[in-house]
Amino acid sequence: MRTSMRISLRLLALLACAICSQASLERENNEGTNMANHKLSGVIQWKYEKRPFCNAFTGCGRKRTYPSYPPFSLFKRNEVEEKPYNNEYLSEGLSDLIDINAEPAVENVQKQIMSQAKIFEAIKEASKEIFRQKNKQKMLQNEKEMQQLEERESK
């Protein structure tokens, strides 16, 4: 009789604990819906804000599928068709370029650029040749080692 009484008391205590925990969970859930009463409501921002859509073509905030401005080439094409060519402006620009190229300072810079380009090409060719020679030496050395191994194996 005592064992059955102990078992029933333990079951009753377990049931009381389960009911209390269920009540506390319900109270927390009810408070969870009311964020103003939550103790961390001022500390943590509970609302998740989506980041704007970003890509390389349009930037951030809009997608490519949205209608946008016409391509730049259409604007340029229309401007060229509407405006007649100004030959005077074009000829002035060309004459300025010719005058600039005739100056000695520009000629000196052009010569320096060309000489640096030639030096760069010479360095590239020299490095290629050095690479070829090193590869050739490695191949010859590998062939000698292979021959020595074959001679050792044949003896």
UniProtKB/Swiss-Prot annotation:
Region spans: Disordered: 135-155
Record GO cellular component, one term: extracellular space
Superkingdom is Eukaryota
Where does the record place it? Answer: Secreted
Q: In which tissues is it expressed?
A: Central nervous system; most neurons exhibit coexpression with Burs.
Annotated signal sequence is: 1-23
The answer on whether this UniProt entry bears the keyword Signal reads: yes
Q: Tell me which Pfam families the record gives.
A: CCAP
Just give the chief location class. secreted
Give the UniProt record's GO annotations in the biological process aspect: neuropeptide signaling pathway; positive regulation of heart rate
Q: Propeptide per record: which residue ranges? A: 24-49, 64-155
Q: Which GO terms describe its molecular function?
A: hormone activity; neuropeptide receptor binding
Q: List the disulfide bonds.
A: C54-C60
Keywords of the record, alphabetical order, are: Amidation, Cleavage on pair of basic residues, Disulfide bond, Hormone, Neuropeptide, Secreted, Signal
Q: Which residues carry this modification: Cysteine amide?
A: C60
Basic and acidic residues: which segments have biased composition?
141-155
Looking up InterPro entries in the UniProt record yields: CCAP
| Function as written in the Swiss-Prot or TrEMBL entry | Cardioregulatory neurohormone that increases heart beat rate during adult wing inflation; has no effect on beat amplitude. The effect of CCAP is both ino- and chronotropic.
Q: What is this protein called?
A: Cardioactive peptide
The protein's organism comes out as Drosophila melanogaster
> What's the name of its gene?
CCAP
